[in-house]
Amino acid sequence: MEYVKLGRSDLVSSVVALGGGGPSRLGLSTGSTRGEAIALIRRAFDLGITMFDSKGIIGGADEIIGEALRPVRQQVLISTKVNLAPAPGLVSRYRMLHRVAARTAETLGLVADAAAVRSHVERTLRALASDRLEVLHLHAVVPGQYAKAVERALPVLQRLKADGLIRAIGITESFTRDPGHAMLTRALDEDFPDVVMTGFNMLNRSARSSVLPAAANRGVGVMGMFAVRQGLRSEADLVRALHRGPGALPVDEAAQRTAAFMRLLRDWGVPSLSHAAYRYCRHERGIDVILVGTGNPTHLEQNVAAALAGPLPEPVLRAVEALT
């Protein structure tokens, strides 16, 4: 494993972080037991991963991450989130209510008040059985929420940091709703986060010209998400992404472009599309840590191996630039 200082914070993290959110939720969404999820987290630690990211949903990944890491808590970093829907402590207990409330809050620009944010953070600490958080993010903030989030929630996070309950303040974007990074660009202009979480992958490289240089100039740590989640799990996913995404290629052209790209990967010894995706993001200048999310121990090992491989061959990099 390789390790990196996370921007201007004093945190030193593995270059790969295990995410507890996303579609898999450590395998809990795909049939894994609590014990299997704990074993996966501990396997990640054995592989050298020291950053573990959760979604701040009480009764879910936070509690499992806390239990799994208790024996090695002093050796790891925990990153988690507070959602900004009103009454975050309530909605975080129920996944469907969480989704509905978060979507409504995004649409209407609603933000929890300061007391609700602090209460949620305290509940998260209890769920993790921890006395501190290394990184606490304002979660999935959309442009319409940003001003209220800074007004209401940021002072709470600053007090928590001053009290030693959190070591770094972060903010994550809603990549699917804000693919051009308008919110993070504004946050970096105002220079309050220590860490940001941004979407970046082979199909949407726009952070390269906005978030990444701004973060570098400010000394802000960058965690990269969505390395494979948008159309990069399989050949069929890539065809759909090229057909339905920006540019909307005719399906036959999308299939031909995908087939040519997959042939190139094979010719250069790149074993899979997801391997290429993780490797690509890991070596993007300006991204400190990439998130991997899985419930499968074999996939975890493969993803870590991909991230720790060298940069992709130059012909493959040129082909990535030509994909979209």
Q: Which residues fall in each region the model found?
A:
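N-terminal binding-site loop/beta-alpha segment at the start of enzyme catalytic domains
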Residues: 1-88
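Beta/alpha (TIM)-barrel catalytic core signal, keyed to glycine-rich beta->alpha loops juxtaposed to Asp/Glu
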Residues: 3, 141-324
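Conserved, mostly hydrophobic/aromatic
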Residues: 6, 18, 37, 52, ...
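Acidic (Asp/Glu)-rich catalytic clusters
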Residues: 8-10, 66-77, 125-131, 158-162, ...
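Structural preference for beta-strand elements that scaffold enzyme active sites
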Residues: 13-17, 50-51, 57, 75-79, ...
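Short, acidic/polar
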Residues: 30-44, 112-127, 177-187, 277
